[in-house]
Curated annotation (Swiss-Prot):
PANTHER family listed in its UniProt record: RECOMBINING BINDING PROTEIN SUPPRESSOR OF HAIRLESS
Protein's UniProt name: Recombining binding protein suppressor of hairless
Region (DNA-binding): 57-67, 165-170, 192-197
Connected disease: Adams-Oliver syndrome 3: An autosomal dominant form of Adams-Oliver syndrome, a disorder characterized by the congenital absence of skin (aplasia cutis congenita) in combination with transverse limb defects. Aplasia cutis congenita can be located anywhere on the body, but in the vast majority of the cases, it is present on the posterior parietal region where it is often associated with an underlying defect of the parietal bones. Limb abnormalities are typically limb truncation defects affecting the distal phalanges or entire digits (true ectrodactyly).
Outcome reported for the amino acid change (mutating residue 169 to E): In AOS3; shows decreased binding to the HES1 promoter compared to wild-type
Region Disordered, annotated ranges: 1-30, 465-500
Keyword line: Acetylation, Activator, Cytoplasm, Disease variant, DNA-binding, Host-virus interaction, Notch signaling pathway, Nucleus, Repeat, Repressor, Transcription, Transcription regulation
Gene Ontology terms: cellular component: chromatin; cytoplasm; MAML1-RBP-Jkappa- ICN1 complex; nucleolus; nucleoplasm; nucleus; transcription repressor complex
CDD domains, per database record: IPT_RBP-Jkappa
Role according to the record: Transcriptional regulator that plays a central role in Notch signaling, a signaling pathway involved in cell-cell communication that regulates a broad spectrum of cell-fate determinations. Acts as a transcriptional repressor when it is not associated with Notch proteins. When associated with some NICD product of Notch proteins (Notch intracellular domain), it acts as a transcriptional activator that activates transcription of Notch target genes.
C-alpha cells in the first residue's frame, strides 16, 4: 500500500507527560468549589471539533478516492491560548507549547497523517481514503493530540461514517433511508469542474458572505418548506426526506445566514431535470433554482457565488441547460465535539475519553429528586455538579449516570423552598479536576412551600453504588425541583442576497 511520505505509523509513539520544570507534577487534586466558581465565571474551555461527511466512498485497487469534503479539525475556545501561555510561563518553548495532531481511519494498516495546526485553529485532512481491502461497513476517524513537549492530550473520535461503493445511479427509494437526506439535517455542497480534484470548491460563509472556498467547507441545515411558504427571515419547516422538486432553505450552521428559497433539482449531464421527484441521495449532483426567478440557479464563478440563468432545452421542455458551476454535489455531514478544562491545573492522564451528555431525565420530586444523565463515554471517576455544588453520583454504565439533585438551599442560603426560578449549569467533573462542560442546565421552579422529608434518594444511591460521597454535600429535607433543559433553537435566519 502506498503511504504518504514522511507519515508516522498509525499509532504515533505514546508520550508520557514530561515532569515539571522543578521535578514531577503533584498528584491529581479533586476540584474545589472555589475552582468551579472561577471556571463558571471565566469559561476558559478547550474544545476539539471534528467535522466530517457521514459517508465515504471506497477506493478500489490502486486508486485513492480522498474523502470529500475533507475531514476538518478545529480547536475552539479561549482555553487553547491560555494553556499555551501557561506552558510558556512554566518554561516551555513556543514549539513545546504547540498542539500537534495526527488523524487516521482507525485502521492499523494505514498510516496516520499529521495535521498542520501551526498559526491557525483548524486543519483539513485532504488525503484520507479507505481501500476496498478494508472490509468495514462503518468506521470512525481517530485524532491523536499532544503538545510539542510530548504531553498527551488524548485520542478523539469522529461520529460513525458509512462506507459506500459509489453514488447510487438508480432511482433512490426510502428503503435505503441511511443514504437519503432528512429535513433539518446538515449537508455540505461542493463543485468540481471536469472531475478534477484540484478544482473542488465548497459552499462556505465567511465575513457575512456566501462564497466558494477551496480551503474550508460549510455545514448547512437543509430545511424542507411548504411550496407556498413566502420568503422571510422566519419560516415554518416540514419533516420528511428531501425529494427533488421540493422547496428548501439552506442555513449556515455556524452563522445562521441563509440563502433565499430554493427548489432542489436533479442534474443529468449538463441539464437540470424539472420533473424529477425521487429522494435526494448521498453524493448526488443537484442544482438549486432560486424560486420565483426567471430560470436563475445558484452558481459559482471562481470564489464568488452568483446567479446563473439556465437555457430552456428546445426539444425537451422538462429540462434546462446549466453550466458546470451550477452543479453541486450534496453529502450529509456530522460533527463530534469535545470540551474540557483543567480545573485544578495540568493533569498526568489524557483528558479523553471526554464524556458527552445527550439528555437529562428528572425522576421523582422534593427530597427524592434524582437526575438521570444519558450520553457517551461515562466513567466511574466522574461526578455531576450543579453550578458550584457537587452532587452525590452513581455510575451505571458508559451511557448512563444517576445523581441526587442538590437542595435549593445549596444555592440560596436560608431558602427552605424555591421562591423564584433558579437555573444552574450541569457539568461533569473527573476526580483529577478536569471539568467537562455540557450545554445543559437544570431549573428549580417556585413551589408554594416545603415538601415532606423523605430519605429515599440516599438509600437508592447507597444500595446501588460503592462510590464515595462528595466532599461537600448539601442536603436538606425540604425543597423542590423541576426540569432539566437543553438550549433549544428556533429556525430564524438572515437571508443573503445572491449576486446576479
Amino acid at each position: 500500500m502506498d503511504h504518504t511520505e514522511g507519515s508516522p505509523a498509525e499509532e504515533p509513539p505514546a508520550h508520557a507527560p514530561s515532569p515539571g520544570k522543578f521535578g514531577e507534577r503533584p498528584p491529581p487534586k479533586r476540584l474545589t468549589r472555589e475552582a468551579m466558581r472561577n471556571y463558571l465565571k471565566e469559561r476558559g474551555d478547550q474544545t476539539v471539533l471534528i467535522l466530517h461527511a457521514k459517508v465515504a466512498q471506497k477506493s478500489y485497487g490502486n486508486e485513492k478516492r480522498f474523502f470529500c469534503p475533507p475531514p476538518c479539525v478545529y480547536l475552539m475556545g479561549s482555553g487553547w491560548k491560555k494553556k499555551k501561555e501557561q506552558m510558556e510561563r512554566d518554561g516551555c518553548s513556543e514549539q513545546e507549547s504547540q498542539p500537534c495532531a495526527f488523524i487516521g481511519i482507525g485502521n492499523s494498516d494505514q498510516e496516520m497523517q499529521q495535521l498542520n495546526l501551526e498559526g491557525k485553529n483548524y486543519c483539513t485532512a485532504k488525503t484520507l481514503y479507505i481501500s476496498d481491502s478494508d472490509k468495514r461497513k462503518h468506521f470512525m476517524l481517530s485524532v491523536k493530540m499532544f503538545y510539542g513537549n510530548s504531553d498527551d492530550i488524548g485520542v478523539f473520535l469522529s461520529k460513525r461514517i458509512k462506507v459506500i461503493s459509489k453514488p447510487s445511479k438508480k432511482k433512490q427509494s426510502l428503503k435505503n433511508a441511511d443514504l437519503c437526506i432528512a429535513s433539518g439535517t446538515k449537508v455540505a455542497l461542493f463543485n468540481r469542474l471536469r472531475s478534477q480534484t484540484v478544482s473542488t470548491r465548497y459552499l462556505h460563509v465567511e465575513g457575512g458572505n456566501f462564497h466558494a472556498s477551496s480551503q474550508q467547507w460549510g455545514a448547512f441545515f437543509i430545511h424542507l418548506l411548504d411550496d407556498d411558504e413566502s420568503e422571510g427571515e422566519e419560516f415554518t419547516v416540514r419533516d420528511g426526506y428531501i425529494h427533488y422538486g421540493q422547496t428548501v432553505k439552506l442555513v449556515c450552521s455556524v452563522t445562521g445566514m441563509a440563502l433565499p428559497r430554493l427548489i432542489i433539482r436533479k442534474v443529468d449531464k449538463q441539464t437540470a431535470l424539472l420533473d424529477a421527484d425521487d429522494p435526494v441521495s448521498q453524493l448526488h449532483k443537484c442544482a438549486f433554482y432560486l424560486k420565483d426567478t426567471e430560470r436563475m440557479y445558484l452558481c459559482l464563478s471562481q470564489e464568488r457565488i452568483i446567479q446563473f440563468q439556465a437555457t430552456p432545452c428546445p426539444k425537451e421542455p422538462n429540462k434546462e441547460m446549466i453550466n458546470d458551476g451550477a452543479s453541486w454535489t450534496i453529502i450529509s455531514t456530522d460533527k463530534a465535539e469535545y470540551t474540557f478544562y483543567e480545573g485544578m491545573g495540568p493533569v498526568l492522564a489524557p483528558v479523553t475519553p471526554v464524556p458527552v451528555v445527550e439528555s437529562l431525565q428528572l425522576n421523582g420530586g422534593g427530597d427524592v429528586a434524582m437526575l438521570e444523565l444519558t450520553g457517551q463515554n461515562f466513567t466511574p471517576n466522574l461526578r455531576v455538579w450543579f453550578g458550584d455544588v457537587e452532587a452525590e453520583t452513581m455510575y451505571r454504565c458508559g451511557e448512563s449516570m444517576l445523581c441526587v439533585v442538590p437542595d435549593i438551599s445549596a444555592f440560596r442560603e436560608g431558602w427552605r423552598w424555591v421562591r423564584q426560578p433558579v437555573q444552574v449549569p450541569v457539568t461533569l467533573v473527573r476526580n483529577d479536576g478536569i471539568i467537562y462542560s455540557t450545554s445543559l442546565t437544570f431549573t428549580y421552579t417556585p413551589e408554594p412551600g416545603p415538601r415532606p422529608h423523605c430519605s429515599a434518594a440516599g438509600a437508592i444511591l447507597r444500595a446501588n453504588s460503592s462510590q464515595v460521597p462528595p466532599n461537600e454535600s448539601n442536603t436538606n429535607s425540604e425543597g423542590s425541583y423541576t426540569n432539566a433543559s437543553t438550549n433549544s433553537t428556533s429556525v430564524t435566519s438572515s437571508t443573503a442576497t445572491v449576486v446576479s
